[in-house]
Regions:
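Short amphipathic beta-strand starts and helix->beta connectors
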Residues: 27-33
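Class I S-adenosyl-L-methionine-dependent methyltransferase catalytic core
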Residues: 1-27, 40-41, 46-51, 59, ...
Length: 215
């Protein structure tokens, strides 16, 4: 597996070791996993059969896949496992944003620990959602996404971006921001996004109140 380049130098230095740990945690069918260099280019070497292709395609560091045959590398076509383009996650740029590859890695490892059977779709909650990087990453992978964010400006930025993004992509969607009321008075806001069969819901509020907000 050819490792994807990272714009973050600190993250790039740790990428090979993180890629090893991620594949071990998410792909039980892979073995002999180790980082290697070919002509000065970092790769991740492993042994697996075709049943692992979907998992490999979702790896945060996967740029391309090759099969080692008689000392040569033969390209292997990866399945299209993402529901939306990667620019859903990469377009927003702001100070303090978590590295996109690292966010995907954390989501993959988290989902890899879930033992409950499911139809492929999960419900992902980020109780400190910021501007929605984790939520967008979950949507890309075909999961419903839920978030809570204390900062009103971050909430507004996430809502504005999603509305603009899906409108410009000409994708049928709804994105509604409504007030949240208690005892007849507004105490926050709620964003409900529906797109391509998926749901994203985000509240303004305290992470400690997540259970009540979604209850």
């Amino acid at each position: 597996m050819l490792l994807a380049p990272s714009a973050n130098r600190v993250y790039a230095g740790s990428a090979p070791q993180l890629a090893v740990a991620e594949l071990k945690a998410t792909c039980p069918g892979a073995s002999d996993i180790e980082p290697v260099e070919l002509a000065g280019v970092p790769y991740l070497a492993f042994t697996a059969d075709e049943r692992a292709l979907d998992v490999v395609a979702r790896q945060s560091g996967c740029f391309a896949l090759f099969e080692h045959v008689d000392g040569l590398l033969r390209p292997v076509e990866l399945p299209d496992v993402f529901q939306f383009p990667d620019d859903l996650v990469t377009i927003p740029k702001y100070q303090g944003k978590t590295n996109e590859q690292f966010t995907q890695l954390l989501l993959n490892v988290t989902l890899g620990t879930v033992t409950r059977e499911a139809d492929g779709r999960r419900q992902v909650l980020d109780p400190m959602a910021g501007r929605g990087t984790t939520l967008s990453t979950a949507l890309r992978q075909g999961h419903d996404a839920y978030g809570v964010e204390l900062d009103d400006k971050a909430f507004e930025a996430a809502a504005s971006f999603w509305k603009t993004y899906f409108r410009r992509k000409h994708m049928k969607h709804t994105a509604d921001v409504t007030p949240v009321k208690r005892d007849g008075r507004a105490v926050g806001r709620r964003l409900d996004l529906r797109v391509d069969g998926l749901t994203a819901t985000m509240f303004t509020g305290d992470a400690r109140d997540s259970a009540q907000l979604f209850g």
